[in-house]
Design a protein with these regions (language model features):
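Metal-dependent phosphoesterase core characteristic of DEDDh/y 3'-5' exonuclease domains
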Residues: 2-3, 16-25, 29-57, 77-180
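Residue-level marker for buried hydrophobic side chains located in beta-strands
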Residues: 5-7
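Metal-dependent phosphoesterase signature
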Residues: 53-74
């Protein structure tokens, strides 16, 4: 579907714990795995070490990057009238919308789906405490570092394909050259 995009963001923390949370990187890909937009973002404040250890984005990486007030408008434009899928959409989408509001960027109209909710239901592990399916971590299916926004987008795409029964990205014996 050309109107469906996959989004992932990496941040300075959790909005519920820190109202000044900023995005430090984001990626947006289409359903063919092609990059629509991917960028580091200068949060205008130091990235806490505990968070740097999770996603690997350091202050020196973002010092020359554009701030959200500039690049957020480009992302919002790309998301307009699209179906945006995110793994843990409640976190990623909420933060994008929050930062658009904070910086006076018009909030785009778009449809949202949470790949984590679908995957949790697919796995089927029930949480009596929540009265719902237990949230599952995003499996690292793409090459690269987990918690890199582009790698996480690619892993989300591969996960969606696998859940739908599409194993076309799986290597087959035809892909292996045994002439050595």
């Amino acid at each position: 579907d050309p109107n469906t995009l996959i989004l992932d963001v990496e941040t300075t923390g959790m909005l519920k714990d820190d109202p000044e949370t900023e995005i430090v990187s984001f990626s947006l890909i289409n359903m063919k795995g092609q990059v629509v937009l991917s960028s580091l973002v200068n949060p205008g404040r130091p990235i806490p070490l505990v968070v740097q250890k999770i996603h690997g984005v350091e202050d020196r990486d973002v010092k020359d990057a554009m701030p959200w007030a500039v690049i957020g408008d480009i992302l919002a434009y790309q998301m307009t009238n699209k179906h945006v899928v995110a793994y843990n959409a409640g976190f990623d989408i909420h933060l994008v919308v929050h930062l658009c509001g904070k910086y006076g960027i018009p909030i785009p109209e778009f449809e949202v789906s949470c790949a984590m909710e679908y995957y949790s239901q697919f796995v089927g592990e029930w949480s009596k405490q929540k009265g719902d399916y237990k949230w599952q971590r995003l499996p690292k299916l793409a090459y690269g570092s987990a918690h890199d926004s582009l790698v996480d987008c690619q892993s989300t795409l591969l996960l969606l394909k696998k859940m739908s029964g599409d194993f076309s990205d799986e290597p087959s014996s035809d892909d292996i050259n045994l002439d050595f």
